[in-house]
Amino acid sequence: MLRDWIKENTKSDGTTIIVNENISILPPRTFDGITGLQEVVLPKKLKKIGILSFAWCKGLREIIIPDGVVLIDDEAFRGCVNLEKVNIPSEVVGIGKMAFAFTAIREIVIPDSISIRYIDKGAFYGCSMLDKKCLNIPDGCDFIKD
C-alpha cells in the first residue's frame, strides 16, 4: 500500500519520501515509525494530515506543509524528536490533540492571515525547546483547549 503513496524517485534508503501529487489525504499512520525518514515532500493538493501520519519519525528535522492543508490531525508529528521547524499554512482550521507533542520545535510560523479555529489539547506538549515568545497565536483562533 505504501507504494501507492510515494513517487518512484523516492530514495530507496528511506531517508526521503516524495508523496504522489494526486494524494489529498494522508490516512492514519501512513509513515508512522519510519525512524530514518529525514525529508518529506508533500503534494500541493494535500488537504489533511491524518492521525499519527508521521509519528515517531525520529530523523525528520523540518516539514514544509503546503498551502491548502486545512487539518493537522491528532498526534500527526508526535515523537518526531528532531523536528525543529514547521510552518503552518494560512488555510489550516485545526491542529489536533498532541499534533506536535514531544518534538524539538524551536519556532513555529503561524501567519496572521490564518483561518485557524482551534488548537487542541496538548498540541505542543513536551516541546521543551519552543520559546513561548515564538508561538504567536493569531486573533482568528477561537479557542485553545487545555
Please name every model-derived segment.
Residues 11-25, 35-48, 58-71, 81-94, ...:
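Structural signature of tandem-repeat unit edges
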